[in-house]
């Protein structure tokens, strides 16, 4: 037998041996028949194989799952697995929430986060209930739709009462150092709330807080015309004429999604490093590693060089690790800390929602996720600000920029007073809200007072 024959036989034997070890059970093959999408075949197979091993221990569970997948329009029972300590499931070096994993496999391959899912009322063991069992039946969950934001109605002829043409938080004194609050999966700690709630009201408390920088928004009357109110007219014949007359006095400015939902700039102290990263994927990870594959969903800080980098920056960069997961779903932006060290976030939209001072810095520890921007709340603020003049609307541009530092924090509880004193930080610009503001400001015309860096 010559060498070629020996090599051929050896290769054939190895192939046979490999196929034995990679044997896929009939139950797994059958369930994979309902898989959605073409990507990550191996990952999906491992996820389903892991599930089948768990369901085999429960009589009728696999059959119930097959019934749910084959007849999606028919009612089905819960298909459950035991809840792990941290609620997550590991599949091939990747951890995820079980109901998200299997909804991604069998219904929505583009699913990014559990924030996009809501359980149906018939589900007895939804993930959100935090019971010992978790339902992974993909037809016991529905996908949350992105809310349609109403257009902003800009008056063509603005008339303001003397002394009331500007939003009052222009005149609120910024603290010498930002307040600090700490967040966890159970919410903000009580110490944080007691030390920062004195400065600003949340949407629910803003009316009762006389010191709130947003106080003028709460008392702002709604625009002269609201499409939802038009249906309440007692005289159906007057509706069309009233609409025409009122719409002649206002310009409708609608929100539209941009090609890139955000851009990210990386800084070391007060120096920008590298190119701006444009986010076209709704899920983006900013980490401290290099990215040889140039994935569009990863912004890797490890590959960026800076000749002015000192030892503190070098040490901080080593601790960024897995960094932060940013995801944009249903008009909301979330930040999840994947690093072993905390991240620190300054988001005026988030601070407004929680009733903190606009400049407050929130600490997000490892493993925690925080909503850092809400398009609907921004839309309400924008609609109300239009009645307060150009400067009031322009002030909202600050809400469209989010600053985030890695490992090292800043503010009243830290020796660094400003974000530019932290070794490693990023600035996130939200393109959709910024473009919406720009269109509204264009409709409003020139400001009554000159806009400057100190206005």
UniProtKB/Swiss-Prot annotation:
Polar residues composition-biased segments: 229-238
Q: Does the keyword Phosphoprotein apply?
A: yes
Keywords associated with the record: Cytoplasm, Developmental protein, DNA-binding, Metal-binding, Nucleus, Phosphoprotein, Transcription, Transcription regulation, Ubl conjugation, Zinc
Q: Where is the MH2 domain?
A: 261-455
Residues recorded with modification Phosphoserine: 25, 453, 455
Which ranges are annotated Low complexity under compositional bias? 192-212
The post-translation modification note in this UniProt entry reads: Phosphorylation on Ser-453 and/or Ser-455 is required for interaction with Smurf. Phosphorylation on Ser-25 by key/Nemo promotes export from nucleus and antagonizes BMP signaling.
Per the entry, what this protein does is: Required for the function of decapentaplegic. May play an important role in mediating Dpp signaling. Involved in the BMP signaling pathway.
What's the subunit arrangement here? Homotrimer. Interacts with MAN1. Interacts with Sec13 and Nup93-1.
User: What name does UniProt use for this protein?
Assistant: Protein mothers against dpp
Tell me the classification of the organism that encodes this protein: Eukaryota, Metazoa, Ecdysozoa, Arthropoda, Hexapoda
């Amino acid at each position: 037998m010559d060498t070629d024959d020996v090599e051929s036989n050896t290769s054939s034997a190895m192939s046979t041996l490999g196929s034995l070890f990679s044997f896929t059970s009939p139950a797994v093959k059958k369930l994979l028949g309902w898989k959605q999408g073409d990507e990550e075949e191996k990952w999906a197979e491992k996820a389903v194989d892991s599930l089948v091993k768990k369901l085999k221990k429960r009589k009728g569970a696999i059959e119930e799952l097959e019934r749910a997948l084959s007849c999606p329009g028919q009612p089905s029972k819960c298909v459950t697995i035991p809840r792990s300590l941290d609620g997550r499931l590991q599949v091939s070096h990747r951890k995820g929430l079980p109901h998200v994993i299997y909804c991604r496999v069998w219904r929505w391959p583009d699913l990014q986060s559990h924030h996009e899912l809501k359980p149906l009322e018939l589900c007895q063991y939804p993930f959100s209930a935090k019971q010992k069992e978790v339902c992974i039946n993909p037809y016991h969950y529905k996908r949350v739709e992105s809310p349609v934001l109403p257009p902003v109605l800009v008056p063509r002829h603005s008339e303001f009462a003397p002394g009331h043409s500007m939003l009052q938080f222009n005149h609120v004194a910024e603290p010498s150092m930002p307040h600090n609050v700490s967040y966890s999966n159970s919410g903000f700690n009580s110490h944080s709330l007691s030390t920062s709630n004195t400065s600003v009201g949340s949407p629910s408390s803003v009316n009762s807080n006389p010191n709130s920088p947003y106080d003028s928004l709460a008392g702002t009357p709604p625009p002269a015309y609201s499409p939802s109110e038009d249906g309440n007219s007692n005289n159906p014949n007057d509706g069309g004429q009233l609409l025409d007359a009122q719409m002649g006095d206002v310009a409708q400015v609608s929100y539209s999604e941009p090609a890139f939902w955000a851009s990210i700039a990386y800084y070391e102290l007060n120096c920008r490093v590298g190119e701006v990263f444009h986010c076209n994927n709704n899920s983006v990870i900013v980490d401290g590693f290099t990215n040889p594959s140039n994935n569009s969903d990863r912004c890797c800080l490890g590959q960026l060089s800076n000749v002015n980098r000192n030892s503190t920056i070098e040490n901080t960069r080593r601790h960024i690790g897995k960094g932060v997961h940013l995801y944009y779903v249903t008009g909301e932006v979330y930040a999840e800390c994947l690093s072993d060290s905390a991240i620190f976030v300054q988001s005026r939209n988030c601070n407004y929602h929680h009733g903190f001072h606009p400049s407050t810095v929130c600490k997000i520890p490892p493993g925690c996720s925080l909503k850092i921007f809400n398009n609907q709340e921004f839309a309400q603020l924008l609609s109300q600000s239009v009645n307060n003049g150009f400067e009031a609307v322009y002030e909202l541009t600050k809400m469209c920029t989010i600053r985030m530092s890695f490992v090292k924090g800043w503010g009243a509880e830290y020796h660094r007073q400003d974000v530019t004193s932290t070794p490693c930080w990023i600035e996130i610009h939200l393109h959709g809200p910024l473009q919406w503001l720009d269109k509204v400001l264009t409709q409003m015309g020139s400001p009554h007072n000159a806009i400057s860096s100190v206005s």
